[in-house]
Design a protein with these regions (language model features):
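Transmembrane alpha-helices and adjacent helix-loop boundaries
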Residues: 3, 12, 24-27, 31, ...
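Short, hydrophobic transmembrane alpha-helix segments
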Residues: 5-18, 36-45, 62-74, 351-362, ...
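Alpha-helical membrane-interface segments at transmembrane helix boundaries
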Residues: 15-23, 95-99, 246
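Membrane-interface helix-loop junction between the first two transmembrane segments
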Residues: 37-51, 181-184, 312
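Short amphipathic alpha-helical coupling elements at transmembrane boundaries
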Residues: 96-100, 184-195, 515-516, 526
């Protein structure tokens, strides 16, 4: 197989492609600056940056194209007023309560995902899910002529100028101003800085304002080259986190150099034109180079990347983690009456579709399938304490594997019926859980979340969206299950088996070992628990459950749809599980029913808004909805009576003597 070049190697062509790559590279560099500065000031990785960029880009287009506002005043209003105000609002309502409660990186990340999902849901409600064209380009115009006949776009020049100005401004502010001194103090120790008189909340608010400003700048810069898509643009900007991770969330020069370098490399790869079937793969590498970079950067960064001021990992995302002394039954919906009530509600919701017809019944077919996918999140995150954002990828592998086996597209195997194909796809996908389980041995929290997110995104781009996965596949149900009600009954039986398997996993010695690993990994190691083996087991079981659910989703729709397993949907599913209660199996079933029911019964985007609001409010809802019955039943114990110091006793006596 030979690889041909699009044109003879020449310095002129190389320079032209490098100049073209500066457009995307400069946007990635701006994204890196915003992420690094925001992390310096707040200690939090702005994981919602992509959604913030999308929101500002949509608002600018709506005001300029639809309402015919003038471009430059509108641009100034969006970037200098709306975007910073959004950042301050998010700091006050979302992140500040988490900081005051001393939440760990896991809860902080979930709150950021809540903001991400919420903004996407709002965009879908306001502007619809269909992509929109015609985003305004403030710096549009004739290309700038350079010596030698080369050209450079005016907006690229503007972005490079913004990088220079922002970089110098941040460096000058950090080194030579009082604000920079306060910033360094807050970064070193927020509580100690507050005790010395530093307004840590003000520093944090400025950090979030700057982060959303740069996010808006990135969205405005990229929107003219793309169709505005409420799912595509946030994911594209999120992929540029690679430059900040490569800089270890500390070095602005490294982030800028990485962003520009990746942009140029992505452009230079367009010269490759391999012959044969390699062309789609090479094109996928060229268009998704930032995904590869994010995966590589997250793996090379190791466990040192954190998303908050607490040590990496923090408290587990469970309904038990906030309760004094733990308590029993946390993983079963809160135990007692709360667990029985949740079970009754789930049973009613699962039986209701037997009275549905037509489109309502076809929509309900997705509920048991999605519940199995969400159960995989419960096993990995709720029971195992490992933050995995890539379960949608395993669900897609289950659906794609079933379709390939049924279509006779697997070498050496004939076309299989639906049931054997589904079971074989699950068995083949389960060991692939080791691909994310191995990195989990040395990583927790945000470091692991970035690896699993990049892995799921890579599966979506390099596997699900390739031509072989989108053409010529069949997913016909067995004759006995061809009817929607019969197929729904079969799904319920498989869901019941999945719930029994998860319940068995959570009981006995294995369940106690998983709980020990989740609650305190170092203590579990000291007690002789095989922590690496348990992590691998959690990911393998999670991959199998997700693959089973994904295969059922494909059979329910009678087709493989790559969009159903988009990484953004995976983020929504993860946030929904945490909101329902990360260690609650019944909560996963309830979350699946609500996700499907809200979108099918109302307007697309309502479920994302609901999940986003609850996830963003995780600081006020520790443990999720599953913890509410326990929180009401078991209020926190009274604090022991305080004991005054000698100075306090003298002050009390003085105050008591006053008339």
């Amino acid at each position: 197989m030979t690889v041909l070049l699009a044109a003879p190697d020449s310095f002129g062509l190389t320079l032209d492609l490098a100049l073209a790559g500066l457009t995307v590279g400069s946007a990635a560099a701006l994204s890196g600056i915003g992420l690094v500065v925001c992390h310096r000031a707040t200690g939090v990785l702005n994981i919602a940056q992509g959604a913030q960029a999308m929101a500002v880009a949509y608002l600018l287009r709506d005001l300029v194209v639809v309402r015919h506002w003038p471009v430059w005043p509108t641009l100034a209003c969006c970037l200098l007023v709306v975007a910073p105000a959004l950042g301050v609002l998010l700091d006050v309502l979302v992140h500040r309560p988490l900081q005051r409660r001393g939440a760990g990186p896991a809860e902080t990340m979930v709150a950021g995902l809540g903001v991400f999902v919420l903004l996407i849901g709002v965009a879908v409600l306001l502007w619809g899910p269909a992509p929109l064209a015609g985003a305004p380009s403030p710096f549009g115009g004739a290309p700038i002529r350079l010596p030698g006949g080369h050209t450079l776009r005016p907006d690229t020049v503007a972005q490079l100028a913004a990088i220079l100005v922002l970089g110098l401004a941040v460096a000058a502010t950090t080194r030579w101003t009082r604000l920079g001194l306060h910033l360094r103090a807050v970064v070193d120790d927020r509580r100690l800085a507050a005790l010395t008189g530093v307004d840590a909340d003000r520093v944090s608010a400025l950090g979030w304002a700057f982060g959303t400003f740069t996010a808006g700048l990135v969205g405005v810069a990229l929107a003219p080259y793309l169709l505005l898509d409420p799912y595509g643009l946030p994911l594209l900007v999120m992929e540029t986190m690679a430059v900040a991770v490569a800089a270890r969330l500390r070095s602005i020069p490294v982030a800028v150099a990485t962003g520009l370098g990746l942009g140029i490399a992505q452009s230079e790869l367009t010269r490759l034109r391999p012959s044969g079937q390699l062309l789609p793969l090479v094109q996928a590498v060229q268009s998704n180079l930032f995904v590869i970079a994010l995966l590589a950067a997250a793996l090379l960064a190791g466990p040192g990347i954190t998303g908050g001021r607490a040590p990496d990992g923090g408290a587990p995302l469970t309904s038990r983690s906030h309760r004094p002394g733990g308590g029993r039954g946390g993983g079963r919906g809160g135990g007692g009456g709360g667990g029985r009530s949740a079970g009754a509600v789930c049973l009613v919701l699962l039986l209701l579709p037997f009275g549905f017809r037509g489109n309502d019944l076809r929509s309900a077919l997705l509920v048991p399938a999605l519940a199995l996918v969400l159960l995989s999140v419960v096993v990995v995150t709720g029971y195992g304490g490992q933050t995995s954002l890539g379960q949608a990828g395993y669900a897609g592998l289950g659906a794609l594997g079933t379709a390939l086996l049924m279509s006779g597209r697997v070498p050496g195997l004939p076309a299989l019926p639906a049931v054997p194909a589904l079971l074989l796809a699950v068995l083949a996908t389960a060991p692939l859980g080791l691909l994310t389980g191995r990195p989990a041995i040395r990583r927790r929290g945000l470091a692991l979340a970035l690896v699993t997110f990049a892995f799921g995104t890579a599966l979506s781009r390099f596997v699900f969206q390739q031509p072989y996965a989108t053409t010529g596949l069949t997913l016909d149900r067995p004759a006995l299950l061809d009817g929607d009600r019969a197929f729904y009954l079969a799904e319920l039986l498989l869901l019941g088996l999945g719930l029994l398997a998860v319940r068995a996993l959570h009981r006995g010695r294995l369940g106690r070992a998983l709980t020990a690993m989740r609650d305190h990994e170092a203590g579990a190691v000291a007690a002789g628990v095989d922590v690496p083996g348990l992590k691998l087991l959690a990911f393998v079981v999670g991959a199998a459950l997700a693959a089973l659910g994904g295969g059922l989703m494909g059979l329910a729709g009678r087709a493989f749809d790559a969009a159903s397993f988009d990484p953004v949907r995976g983020l929504l599913w993860f946030a929904a599980v945490v909101v329902a209660g990360a260690d609650s199996a019944l909560g996963a079933v309830l979350a699946a029913a609500l996700l499907i029911g809200l979108d099918a019964g109302t307007v697309t985007g309502v479920s994302a808004v609901a999940v986003g609001v609850l996830a963003a409010a995780i600081g006020r809802l520790p443990g999720g909805l599953a913890a509410l019955p326990t929180a009401r039943r078991d209020p926190p114990p009274d604090l022991p009576p305080g004991r005054l110091t000698p100075t306090g006793r003298r002050l009390r006596a003085t105050l008591n003597r006053r008339p």
